[in-house]
A protein has these predicted regions:
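Conserved interdomain linker/interface between the two RecA-like ATPase lobes of SF2 helicase motors
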Residues: 1-103, 151
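Conserved C-terminal RecA-like helicase domain
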Residues: 92-172
Length: 172
């Protein structure tokens, strides 16, 4: 049995909320001193008590906080110099959707130099694919996404794609 207790990259859990009042995405530690973050619990419980603009109750109350979009989360991580990052999504389809939403938002997280380096890594891992294989696997979309600094990594991907993503992530 081999046991490794050192992680090459530390895993830290955060909770993100979009504050509809300030129009800002905010990040909070999920666990503080071994307990669920009470500040987040207070924010969410107080948010349900906010009244409408007239100050009267009744009808639907506006929600103070909502889940941020995938591009908002990535922008927040970039602003806080927390990239590269892993976002855990429990559905292959949602993993793919997350990449598409970031790409559709026009996100590019790499410099020209990084893009060139990423393309070389992906091309090296996929050099044995035929042109037909590349078409069937939508290789050109994959390499463009990864070169922009955005990719998914899930069990449904071919090993070549996953290995390329892993190498890119390990290199930062």
């Amino acid at each position: 049995m081999v046991v490794e207790t050192t992680r090459p990259i530390e895993l830290v859990n955060h909770f993100a909320l979009f504050d509809n009042a300030s129009k800002q995405c905010e990040m909070f530690e999920t666990v503080v001193a071994g307990e669920p973050n009470r500040h987040v619990q207070r924010l969410l419980s107080n948010a349900t008590q906010i009244r409408g603009r007239s100050g009267q109750s009744g009808g639907k109350k506006p929600r103070r906080f909502s889940p941020p979009t995938r591009p908002e989360i990535v922008e927040l991580l970039e602003d806080k110099s927390m990239l590269p990052a892993i976002v855990f999504i429990f559905s292959r389809a949602q993993c793919e959707d997350a990449v598409h939403s970031c790409m559709n938002a026009g996100m590019v997280l790499t410099s020209l130099e990084e893009e060139i380096q990423i393309r070389e890594i992906v091309e090296r891992h996929c050099e044995n694919l035929t042109a037909d294989d590349k078409d069937a696997l939508e290789y050109h979309h994959f390499i463009d996404d990864v070169a922009s600094g955005i990719s998914c990594h899930h069990a449904g991907m071919i090993p070549m794609f996953k290995e390329a993503v892993e190498e890119c992530f390990a290199q930062g």
